[in-house]
């Protein structure tokens, strides 16, 4: 009896140790912190005046010039008038946000970092779009629209008009427009980017980082799985490079598999524990792979 009791206690201890080791590898603190890797990029300071090579400026589409709405535009360091460039369009995460790792998100377009990390400041026009309030008069930092309706219509309208406007005025190639986003912005890649047939036509490829439309039910209308599937059906084979901190990308992989929708999906863990798009301001194997993936698409897209 004592032998059986000791054996059970040993098994329990072994299970506890095994569970702890498993948690170390797949838990929220499993991967290294971004602070362990030195940055090789720094966001350009926000400047006033007209857009030009290497400048990061606030702008407003002319249709909204009597409102508080604005977006951010960065023209690549090697930008020249009359030349053509692929475009990275980005949506920010919710804000204000801060976690126990010190990861922060303001929720404003100027807090976005993905596009600059992906481009390194060269070769791509980088456009950070806003989410608009229910009345279309200002930017919002949580979801889109206002509680409880979270009406996306003004957000959609601004994107539909601003992306072609930026391409027309600054040499963006309308056939090579990437859509990326962090957290809320990751969800927005599909929720906003594939919301209807008109906006879905704007993009050549997608890079959602941390969360994915349909995986989890959120507080805004239309976050249910069936609605997300109807949006995903508008993807129509275009490639997506889906990333997440730690092992969270598996939730996206499993949900997409369950939908039965086939496509050109790439799934990668970022290699960091952080819920923070600043990981792309640091060198990493995944950032290198994402850049190569984008370059290949720009070469094959007509």
Residue spans of the language-model regions?
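Active-site machinery of serine-nucleophile hydrolases
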Residues: 94-160
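Gly/Ser-rich "nucleophile elbow"/oxyanion-hole loop immediately N-terminal to the catalytic nucleophile
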Residues: 78-82, 142-183
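Short glycine-enriched nucleophile-adjacent loop
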Residues: 186-198
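The feature captures the conserved acid-bearing segment of alpha/beta-hydrolase catalytic domains
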Residues: 198-287
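A domain-start/cap signature at the N-terminus of enzymes
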Residues: 25-87, 124, 220, 254, ...
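Catalytic active-site module of serine/aspartate enzymes centered on a nucleophile-bearing elbow/loop
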Residues: 284-302
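Short, solvent-exposed loop/turn and secondary-structure capping segments
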Residues: 83-85, 98-104, 137-142, 190-192, ...
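The conserved beta1-alpha1 loop
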Residues: 89-93
